[in-house]
Amino acid sequence: MGASSSSSVSEKSIHQFTVKDSSGKEVDLSVYQGKVLLVVNVASKCGFTESNYTQLTELYRKYKDQGFVVLAFPCNQFLSQEPGTSEEAHQFACTRFKAEYPVFQKVRVNGQNAAPVYKFLKSKKPSFLGSRIKWNFTKFLVGKDGQVIDRYGTTVSPLSIQKDIEKALAQEL
């Protein structure tokens, strides 16, 4: 784990972070207070792209009116499987998979230059192999209060976590 574990993250909630959208505009994540979030590092040229994007879109459409939002963060750290610009990644998700949820600016999810929001997520829910994200489409379920509920690896399909999403949506703030 090393020095960059939870001790280097002072934020207590995902709502304390500001990120950039695919065009570079700042987005304060406090706008998602009271919503259940599924934060995912996405890639357009991965073997898991088709199934994950399709199911993320399905989940978003099914639960968005109940306060569920997918936050997609393109990442090129795994075999350069998101080689284009942030805008190209956004266009890909929206055109090919009809994504209506936010697709943010490309980020690093591991290492010294990892996005602060990802340092937070990993510090709150390390996997059994440590906090490092192993591959594209790692998913973090975040409750209405901005706390990380669970972390799901690449091979966990988005549709398989519907019960967890429903449980989080049913919780009071």
Swiss-Prot record:
Pfam families for the chain: GSHPx
Bilayer topology annotation: Lipid-anchor
Tissue note: Ubiquitous.
Gene3D superfamilies the UniProt entry points to: Glutaredoxin
GO terms for biological process, alphabetical: embryo development ending in seed dormancy; response to oxidative stress
Physiological role: May constitute a glutathione peroxidase-like protective system against oxidative stresses.
This protein's name: Probable glutathione peroxidase 5
Organism: Arabidopsis thaliana (Mouse-ear cress)
Gene: GPX5
